[in-house]
């Protein structure tokens, strides 16, 4: 039986929440192996001069632990 772990990370993008999620997953793929899914926990944005300056997405990344 496999054992999984969840790691929460925050991705950011100047363009969209979708890009922020994509950036979070791309970053997670650089250091985590065996990613099986993601859950978008929260979306928020930084505002400057009355406009969205940065889209942010908090994401739970689920991955299977090796050797289990």
Where in this protein do the model-derived segments appear?
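Compositionally biased, disordered extreme N-termini, encompassing classical targeting presequences
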Residues: 1-2, 68
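Short, well-ordered alpha-helical segments
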Residues: 2-37
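Flexible glycine-/small-residue-rich
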Residues: 13, 42, 63-65
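Short, conserved loop-to-beta-strand elements that form functional interface hotspots
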Residues: 38-46
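C-terminal structural segments of small proteins and small subunits
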Residues: 49-68
């Amino acid at each position: 039986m496999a054992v999984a772990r969840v790691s929460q990370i925050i991705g950011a993008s100047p363009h969209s929440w979708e890009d922020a999620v994509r950036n979070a997953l791309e970053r997670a793929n650089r250091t985590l192996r065996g990613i099986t899914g993601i859950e978008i926990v929260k979306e928020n944005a930084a505002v400057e001069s009355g406009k969205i300056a940065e889209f942010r997405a908090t994401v739970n990344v689920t991955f299977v632990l090796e050797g289990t």
